[in-house]
């Protein structure tokens, strides 16, 4: 499993700044989709060779009340789910009683804690660090998150113990999983477990939330119509004592890890509750990870015609940022529409891993330009010369030309739509990279 880093500290010590530093390289790969609001508390990070999930836990001061108290509790829960805790303090303001309160909690957590002294730029580092040795976390890590100073060194140190584990986990996943890996994610009680059971064709409630387990997701290989699949089950089912119904323990970290491990992700949405922000955030996580996405609107049976029409119009309105995702209206409980998911799983997987020749991509580019030329910039037309594939899962298409930095977003969207239509790409984002050729006659700067 990909390691999880939790950023912990009192308010205004620079957690959000460090979060942005750690997730920036991944965000840069994915366009900002109009209409999509991202939940900035969780993100995929990559620095050098290290990949990880980052949680910004929000500030904890020790005197929270009301909603702040709930947020602080969420922060403490996030610590429980993390592999590494980066405890941030402010090097300019020195030690604070809230720092000592947080330190006391972290010492009891039995987690790997690294004490990170932020905002050390422009001040005497030794003096800035001196106060914090008393917290008893051993080596201190001075950084300046706003400039990125010391961040690479910090991540190299804290991720070192996990390098071997990550490699082992990847190997284990490849051993345990066969065929297309399907992640099933969604909010609590939307019917994920029912859908998993229906897809497997058997009624099973897997208890895997036991203390001490190293992996929270269960990989279930199975065969359907002579094709192999692996379901990644994250629902976190527990049976209440003396109560028949299963109670779902929701974990955003499990969902993010499942998304990372999957080839195709089914986002399950409860039709009785309409689309809520958390549903959109979940779809956003899938897009940011570059995975194939399918939307399953569950509990469709029994809805009145008017309710169905209302939900369909809401889906059309609110999922405009992901027009290429197929939407299925299903009943996991009764099996309605579940079988139809497989055709979409197959076509989405094929789109994610498709390979195209440079010749074919360049021909599509030329046809697109013939139909609608790029605009003029400073009395010169932007020239797009050729295209080639730069990667898959998600598909990446690299377009070479002149003045590509000046290409407007509207024309990039036009190209994406043309390529998507001609190549029949469904269920996955396409990443376009535009590269400008150097002009050998341009004056040297």
Curated annotation (Swiss-Prot):
Q: GO:BP terms for this protein?
A: ribosome biogenesis
Residues binding GTP 2: 186-193, 233-237, 298-301
Q: Which residues form the EngA-type G domain?
A: 3-166, 180-353
- Coiled coil ranges (UniProt) are none
Keywords in alphabetical order: GTP-binding, Nucleotide-binding, Repeat, Ribosome biogenesis
Q: Which cysteines are joined by disulfide bonds?
A: none
Pfam families listed in its UniProt record:
KH_dom-like (PF14714), MMR_HSR1 (PF01926)
Q: Which GO terms describe its molecular function?
A: ATP hydrolysis activity; GTP binding; ribosome binding
Task: Provide the binding site for GTP 1.
Answer: 9-16, 56-60, 118-121
Listed InterPro entries: AAA+_ATPase, G_ENGA, GTP-bd, GTPase_Der, KH_dom-like, KH_dom-like_a/b, P-loop_NTPase, Small_GTP-bd
KH-like domain span: 354-438
Which PANTHER family is this protein grouped with? GTPASE DER
Report the function annotation for this chain. Answer: GTPase that plays an essential role in the late steps of ribosome biogenesis.
Q: How does it assemble?
A: Associates with the 50S ribosomal subunit.
Q: Which NCBIfam families match?
A: GTPase_EngA (TIGR03594), small_GTP (TIGR00231)
UniProt family annotation: Belongs to the TRAFAC class TrmE-Era-EngA-EngB-Septin-like GTPase superfamily. EngA (Der) GTPase family.
Q: What is this protein called?
A: GTPase Der
Instruction: State the species of origin.
Output: Marinomonas sp. (strain MWYL1)
């Amino acid at each position: 499993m990909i390691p999880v880093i939790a950023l912990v500290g009192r308010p205004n010590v620079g957690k959000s700044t460090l979060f942005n530093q750690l997730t920036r390289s991944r965000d840069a790969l994915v366009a900002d989709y109009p209409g999509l609001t991202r939940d900035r508390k969780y993100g995929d990070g990559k620095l050098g060779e290290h990949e990880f999930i980052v949680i910004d836990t929000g500030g904890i001061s020790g005197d929270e009340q009301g909603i702040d108290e709930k947020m602080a509790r969420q922060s403490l829960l996030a610590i429980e789910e993390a592999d590494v805790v980066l405890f941030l303090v402010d090097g300019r303001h020195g030690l604070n009683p809230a720092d000592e309160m947080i330190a006391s909690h972290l010492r009891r957590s039995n987690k790997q804690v690294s004490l990170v002294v932020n905002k050390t730029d422009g001040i005497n580092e030794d003096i800035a660090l001196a106060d914090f040795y008393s917290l008893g976390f051993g080596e201190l890590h001075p950084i300046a998150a706003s400039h990125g100073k010391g961040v690479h060194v910090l991540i190299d140190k804290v991720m070192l113990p996990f390098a071997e584990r990550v490699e082992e986990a990847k190997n284990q996943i490849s051993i345990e999983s066969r065929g297309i890996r399907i992640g099933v994610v969604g909010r609590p009680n939307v019917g994920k477990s029912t859908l998993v059971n229906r897809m497997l064709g058997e009624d099973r409630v897997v208890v895997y939330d036991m203390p001490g387990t190293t992996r929270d997701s269960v990989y279930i290989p199975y065969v359907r119509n002579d094709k192999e699949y692996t379901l990644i089950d994250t629902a976190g089912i527990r049976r209440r004592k003396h109560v028949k119904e299963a109670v779902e323990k929701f974990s955003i970290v499990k969902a993010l890890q499942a998304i990372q491990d999957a080839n195709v992700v089914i986002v399950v949405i409860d039709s009785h509750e309409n689309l809520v922000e958390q549903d959109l955030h979940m779809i956003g996580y899938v897009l940011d990870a570059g995975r194939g996405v399918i939307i399953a609107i569950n509990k469709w049976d029994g809805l009145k015609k008017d309710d169905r029409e209302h939900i369909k119009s809401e889906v059309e309105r609110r999922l405009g940022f992901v027009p290429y995702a197929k939407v299925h209206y299903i009943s996991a409980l009764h099996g309605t529409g579940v079988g139809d998911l497989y055709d979409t799983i197959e076509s989405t997987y094929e789109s994610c891993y498709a390979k195209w020749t440079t010749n074919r991509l360049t021909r599509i580019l030329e046809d697109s330009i013939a139909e609608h030329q790029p605009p003029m910039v400073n009395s010169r037309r932007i020239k797009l010369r050729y295209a080639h594939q730069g990667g898959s899962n998600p598909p990446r298409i690299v377009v070479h030309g002149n003045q590509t930095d000046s290409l407007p977003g509207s024309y990039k969207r036009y190209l994406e739509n043309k390529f998507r239509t001609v190549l029949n790409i469904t269920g996955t984002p396409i990443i376009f990279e535009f590269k400008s050729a150097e002009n050998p006659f341009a004056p040297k700067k």
